[in-house]
Amino acid sequence: MKQGIHPDYHAVQVTCSCGNTFVTRSTYNGDHMTVDVCSNCHPFYTGKQKILDTGGRVARFEKRYGKKAK
């Protein structure tokens, strides 16, 4: 590898707005980063995700093609 062309890759402490903190490695300038959402509070990872039906498109699709039974 060429010397002096790669960014500094170092440990960074990340703090989420929910209070969760963890350490990762990054090229971010600084030793501390604040984020709004992390895997501890994101709806996808917590299981609280909701499907948004915009304009009844899902209902119209299910009516047209039928909802498959599991």
From Swiss-Prot:
Name-wise, this protein is: Large ribosomal subunit protein bL31
So which cofactors does this thing need?
Zn(2+)
Q: What does this protein do?
A: Binds the 23S rRNA.
Where along this sequence does the record place binding of Zn(2+)? Answer: C16, C18, C38, C41
Q: Which InterPro entries match?
A: Ribosomal_bL28/bL31-like_sf, Ribosomal_bL31, Ribosomal_bL31_A, Ribosomal_bL31_sf
Q: What's in the GO CC field?
A: ribonucleoprotein complex; ribosome
Q: Which GO terms describe its biological process?
A: translation
Q: How is the cofactor bound, in the record's words? A: Binds 1 zinc ion per subunit.
Which molecular-function annotation in GO is an example for this chain? rRNA binding
Q: Subunit structure of this entry?
A: Part of the 50S ribosomal subunit.
Q: Which residues form the signal peptide?
A: none
Name the family: Belongs to the bacterial ribosomal protein bL31 family. Type A subfamily.
Keyword Magnesium on this protein?
A: no
Q: Which UniProt keywords apply?
A: Metal-binding, Ribonucleoprotein, Ribosomal protein, RNA-binding, rRNA-binding, Zinc
Positions of disulphide bridges = none
Per its UniProt entry, which superkingdom is the organism in? Bacteria
**Which Pfam families does the entry link to?**
Ribosomal_L31
| Gene that this polypeptide is encoded by | rpmE
Q: Which HAMAP family did the record assign?
A: Ribosomal_bL31_1
